[in-house]
């Protein structure tokens, strides 16, 4: 992952719904993994521009941390995602495609160990599209 950008989509609160279900909401994310253990995350999620305003899909940019734990899982924390609690994943990489499966869920109540999390493409370098 070092010096690569992982980008794709993940379901929000209804993330376990199949892709063809009308209620499914997917949000985009792009994460660049730096060699020093920092990450830069560009992502979208439902939010309001003003207190008590309408909810819409808004874009965010944050910096967090990542590491490889003793089990070989990728663990990361992003301050405003899951209250900044570290999440860990088992990674399945096939060419330029990658899928991450939860091995620890932190503060996510829609998560369970083994559930598919982020899935998408991996690109060399800092390669944000949004």
Question: Can you annotate each of these PLM segments?
Answer:
Residues 1-65, 69-130:
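Lipid interaction determinants
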